């Protein structure tokens, strides 16, 4: 089908494919916070709690402080699952329906970054423009498909096998994908700027009272 709102100049139908035909799952580690260091280490680790609360749709590994892995054995065990730009990390466990929230990896140069406890790391089988998957997989259009698949009462989770049959919609043109990603990124930057201004104004008010 075609989306109702669209950038000018694009007319082609979008693709709709099953997640299992678009994304390949990698291996995650099971290190808890206690097994990680905030000070130093040999690799960075993406923890599900940070995906749920701290990180946005795009995780720029240069800008965010990530907990570190200190054990060499972990690196050799997960060598085939070192993350790359464009990989998507899904939090598969939460205390509510935010299960399935994800972050797309960006800004990665030579660092070793791994996907941690209660996450499903995915790698696109074909190349996507930066940002598209991060924003699409967090959208209501996608996330609403996950709600009936969630299991558990106090702690909610979603399985890799359940996600395989969910639908991913995307434009065939990487140029159109890129415009969508860039548009939402600019909105995020605007929100951050206004939040900062809001905090500064609140501080000023407090100071003047």
Regions found by a protein language model. Give the residues of each.
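Short amphipathic coiled-coil heptad-repeat segments
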Residues: 1-15, 196-209
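Activation segment
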Residues: 18, 55-56, 194, 202
